[in-house]
Structures are given as structure tokens and as C-alpha cells.
Amino acid sequence: MGAVTYPDEKVIEIIEKYMVPIQVLFDSQPLAARFNIQWTPTVITLDEEGKEHHRTIGFLAPEEFIPSLMLGMAKCHFDREKFSKAIPMLEDILKNHPKSEAAPEAVYVRGVALYKSTHKADFLKEILKRLQAEYPSSEWTKRAKPYSLL
């Protein structure tokens, strides 16, 4: 990723704007053990307290890496119930990276965030509907199937 992804201008911009990157070799102790790093590259999104919210393993090109980073940041906010911060990031993924591997999960997490912030079950139904229409073979579509019972 050092030759292709990390030097990308858009990748640099998002990292400089939102993140504090640290690079750890997969066999560097004690961090490799603490974060269960088994292969490289492993990219982990942590919050300021060191709690993990998102992880990718293996090479990602810039067009996949950027939405993955954004999803990680959104999940940091989501996990701390800061839905008003998570939702715009998830919507940005869906608007600007709709074909990315992160997009189906962004649909799912966005819908759950909307539900948790409003308690309106229609948002859960919308998750399944959108996933079936736009990402029918995604694992996130399968995970949303129970929402058809609402």
C-alpha cells in the first residue's frame, strides 16, 4: 500500500484531516500482540481511548481505502452513539463511493443509526429495501433479512 495507496493525494487529505496514523510492523511487540496483528497490511481504526471500531486486512486501492477509512470513522461515532456525526459520514460513502465494498455496510449502519436516534422502525425496513435493490448479493443484505418481519 506504500507504493500505491498511501501516496494518493485524496488518501493523504483524509488521513491528515481526520486521523493520526501510526505504522506498526506485524511482528513488532507488544503492539502486534495487543491489537492481534497477524498479517500486513492491517489497518485498524481506533478511537482516542484505543478502542477498536473497524479493521481491514490486505491491500486496498485508494478507491476502496478511502471509503473504508470513512466507515471506520463513522463506526467510531456510531459505537459511542454519536449518530449525528456518524450519519453524514455514512451518507458521504453512499454518495461518493456507492460501488465500494464499504457501501453495503454503510447502508446498514446508517439505517441502524437512524433507527436508534428516532426509534422509527421504517428506517430498518429501508435498510433491507435499499440493500436488496443496490447490493443484492452482499452479506449485509442477508443480515438485514429479519427487518422484513417488521
Q: How would you label these PLM feature ranges?
A:
Residues 51, 55-61, 93-103, 118, ...:
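Short solvent-exposed coil/turn linkers within tandem alpha-helical repeat scaffolds
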Residues 89, 126-127:
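Alpha-helical solenoid repeat scaffolds, predominantly canonical TPR units
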Residues 3-64, 69-70:
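Thioredoxin-like thiol-disulfide oxidoreductase module
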Residues 33, 66-100, 116, 134:
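Alpha-helical segment of the N-proximal tetratricopeptide repeat
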Residues 86, 123-124:
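Single-residue signature of alpha-solenoid repeat helices
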